[in-house]
Amino acid sequence: MYSKLVSSAVLFILAFNLQSQVSLSLGSGVLKGFGIPKSFLGFHGGFELPRNNDVTLYLRLGYYLPRKEDDTISTSVTAINPLSSPSTLTVNYLTSTNYTTIEGGTRYYLGNDYDNGFSVYGGSNFMLIINSVKRNYEKLDATGVYSWEGDYELPEYEVPKGTILSLALGLQGGVKYTFPARGTIYADITGNYTLFGKASNTTAQNTALYAPMIFIFNLGFRKDLY
């Protein structure tokens, strides 16, 4: 589903202005959610299409690596074979969460043009945010004696993985410098607030690393194609 969303957005933008200059960008970034204890390191890639010398449309896909929560949680697993001993075990786990972002919007450049020299830029955007939440169970039970995978099963109501899908709006601001015939280095900050979010199950709902307001700091390199 995620790949279809990205492909559709890319095709739409390319079809909108097929004959124009297009730029490709790659870079790294740090995502920080307001009120959550951890930051997420990631990377991004994107397209940018100029409407004129000072206004562009852009699309950016970002992936931010999973982080684990600090608090260990326990659950009970039950033996598949009713004759097994012990019949139940206590297993510890840590919950991890990542962020995937699909971001698009309009940028307005001040100073020099989009593809010339030093400029500052800013604009509004929309963002689709996908959080993958996973419970990472220890291989041994809480006593460190019994290996449980394959011989014991989780409670029927417990799902090891979940997803949160959110739609957000926000603003972006940044600076860039274009080296003639080489490319552009840039740095920008994006802030987004979630208007709508939906968790797929209780595993996703219970993550402590989801935030409705996020900030992303990006560094990267952009290459213009003519």
PLM features: residue spans?
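Extracellular loop and loop/strand-boundary signature of outer-membrane beta-barrel proteins
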Residues: 29-34, 88-94, 155-161, 201-209
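Predominantly the C-terminal beta-signal and adjacent terminal strand-loop region
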Residues: 69-70, 176-226
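Residues that define the transmembrane beta-barrel architecture of outer-membrane proteins
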Residues: 37-43, 96-102, 118, 163-169, ...
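Gram-negative (and chloroplast) outer-membrane scaffold detector with strong preference
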Residues: 49-148, 167, 179-181, 218, ...
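Bacterial Sec-dependent N-terminal signal peptides
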Residues: 1-25
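Flexible, solvent-exposed coil segments and beta strand-coil junctions
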Residues: 21-28, 78-88, 147-155, 196-200
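Transmembrane beta-strand segments that form the barrel wall of outer-membrane beta-barrel proteins
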Residues: 22-43, 57-60, 192
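A generic hydrophobic-segment detector
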Residues: 141-197
